[in-house]
Amino acid sequence: MAFDIHATPSRVPARLDHRPVKKRIALVALATDHTSERDFARICDPDRVGVYVNRIAYENPTTRETLLKTGPRLTAAAAQILPEEAVDVVAYGCTAASIVLG
């Protein structure tokens, strides 16, 4: 079965929003994390705050050693979130690793 699709080019000039939301949060989450993105979505007003996420590798089980392995990965992961753009906050979605790393 064939379909004919008729399209007309738009005459409305296209432009991207410079910054569609007032505040930006860069969230680094663990690859195994099931909740951080949903938690941020529930507490942040999407018309005012954008949450932009990147994940880092993480191997279960949770031990001091596996938590320490996340440290060297954080800078590169955060840098990949909206590269060349300013963010207002960088959050790391792992309290246990934050404590172990200091």
Model-predicted regions and their roles:
Residues 70-102:
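N-terminal glycine-rich phosphate/adenylate-binding segment common to multiple enzyme folds
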Residues 2-79:
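N-terminal glycine-rich anion-binding loop in soluble enzyme alpha/beta folds
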